[in-house]
A protein has these predicted regions:
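Conserved phosphate-binding/catalytic region of the ribokinase-like
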Residues: 17, 34, 66-174
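Conserved beta-alpha-beta core of the PfkB/ribokinase-like small-molecule kinase fold
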Residues: 1-71, 89-90
């Protein structure tokens, strides 16, 4: 979601229609300040999974703590907030009270271009495959980590099976 791409509410309308048809909705955002919150807030009530980076979420809310940031978005209507934390992993906070942090994998980073998009793609795959929430986030983390091992967006991502094997064989940080 980029404010310059839609300041007329069309994104919110699209998500509302998708939800009415039974779709699961995910939203990522490109935002730089609390001034962008008005545009973002219009889509949140129609969002199942809101997945900004911690930097984007902090810029929107002015808050620093991941739990506080996530609760702000839950209060604005999302069902679940998943914050990517870079080298610190990812934080999952669902409206039902489920919350956890998944650590990042130990990798040699070559390029972080597209890591957020790779995380979101891995998350969507996990949803479609019916994984439990923690496995979904771990799979998303693995997809993002593999992306970072290559030079350029998606260079390190090979296949679903390769990503599952990476999850099983690669240690996590911390």
């Amino acid at each position: 979601l980029m404010a310059r791409m839609d300041n007329s509410g069309r994104n919110g309308d699209l998500l509302k229609r998708a939800k009415a048809k039974g779709a699961t909705t995910t939203v990522d955002v490109f935002a730089g300040s609390p001034d962008d919150m008005g545009d973002v807030a219009g889509v949140l009530p129609h969002t199942d999974y809101f997945m900004p980076s911690i930097e984007e979420a902090r810029a929107l809310t002015g808050l620093t703590d991941a739990g506080d940031v996530a609760r702000t978005f839950l209060d604005l209507g999302v069902n679940c907030c998943v914050l990517t934390l870079g080298a610190d992993g990812a934080y999952y906070h669902h409206r039902d009270g489920t919350r956890f942090t998944v650590p990042a994998y130990q990798i040699k980073v070559r390029c972080t271009c597209g890591c957020g998009d790779a995380f979101n793609a891995g998350f969507a795959v996990g949803l479609v495959k019916g994984f439990d929430p923690e496995t979904i986030v771990r799979f998303a983390q693995a997809t993002s980590a593999l992306n970072a091992t290559g030079l350029g967006s998606q260079a390190g991502v090979q296949s679903f099976e390769h990503t599952l094997n990476f999850m099983k064989t690669t240690p996590v940080r911390g």
